[in-house]
Design a protein with these regions (language model features):
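Membrane-interface helix-loop junctions and terminal tails of multi-pass membrane proteins
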Residues: 2-275
Length: 275
């Protein structure tokens, strides 16, 4: 049986999640150690918190992000930056809400990065992955339910579906998604790196990153950078044209950037790195 002490909350593994508790005085028969246990969460409780945080976080991402791409009426035009603002904004807000619980991955690529960096054991990474996929499906599903049928529920609506623009080849789209996701993952690694000096204002950094890539890359590939984000709309709209691009591209970019940061940037002499 695998030891449960391998299941750690990301970030500071020693950090305890505490709360204010009001209760009657303890019996003197209870030892100090027994009292302290009341304020500590067991490993399985940490995993449940992580699962729920990622589930709700990814659902928020899909619900609010994709809502920014829903027209007011069939065939209606969207604001030029409505999708970029919606996705960038909800990413920043979600980081603030669940960041202290799960590091706010809400993206299987970020979870893969954490796994490759040694921040997560593989079973915990699987829990992240399942929560992210389910959360994306639930979040987009709620959006489908509350939207007018003639706008989002029609078979050909295609709202929030990621697909390459006409004229872009599969390999071009693949490279765009790989490179852009790679840049995102370099930012993730930098924020997690204790010697980079970039641990503060993480939500603002990712807000700028998502907004920038949405504006620049969105017109070409939809700026997925997240397999779960592309999977949910594909399921509901039964749209699988070149869908593989949004798995192979982001994951290949993630692996390349994570290994580059781990074995090249982090391997530099400590004196040459920002303290």
């Amino acid at each position: 049986m695998m030891s449960t002490d391998k299941f750690l909350v990301p970030g500071n593994e020693e950090q305890k999640i505490s709360s204010v508790v009001f209760e009657a005085p303890m019996s003197e028969a209870k030892s100090t150690a027994e009292q302290n246990q009341l304020y500590e969460r067991q490993p399985w409780q940490k995993l449940v918190l992580i699962f729920l945080a990622e589930l709700f976080g990814t659902a928020f991402l899909m619900f609010f992000g994709c809502m920014g791409l829903v027209p007011k009426y069939p065939g209606g035009e969207l604001g030029e930056y409505s999708g970029a603002i919606a996705f960038a904004g909800i990413v920043a807000v979600t980081i603030v809400i669940i960041g202290r619980i799960s590091d706010c991955h809400i993206n299987p690529c970020v979870t893969l990065c954490a796994l490759l960096l040694g921040k997560l054991p593989i079973l915990t990474a699987i829990i992240y992955f399942v929560a992210e996929v389910l959360g994306a499906i639930i979040g987009y599903g709620i959006l489908v339910v509350i939207s007018p049928y003639n706008i989002l529920n029609s078979p050909d609506s295609g709202v929030c579906v990621t697909s390459p623009v006409v004229g872009l080849t599969a390999w071009q789209a693949l490279l765009i998604e790989a490179i852009t996701t790679g840049v995102l993952i370099l930012l993730v690694c930098s924020v997690w790196d204790p010697k980079s000096g970039n641990g503060d204002c993480g939500s603002l950094k990712f807000l700028v990153m998502i907004f920038l890539t949405s504006v620049v890359v969105g017109p070409f590939t939809g700026n997925s950078l997240n397999p779960a984000r592309s999977l949910a709309p594909a399921i509901y709209n039964n749209s699988w044209n070149m869908h593989w691009i949004y798995w192979v591209g982001p994951f290949s970019g993630t692996i390349t950037s994570t290994l580059f940061y781990k074995y090249i940037i982090m391997a530099l002499d400590n004196e040459e790195r920002v303290k």
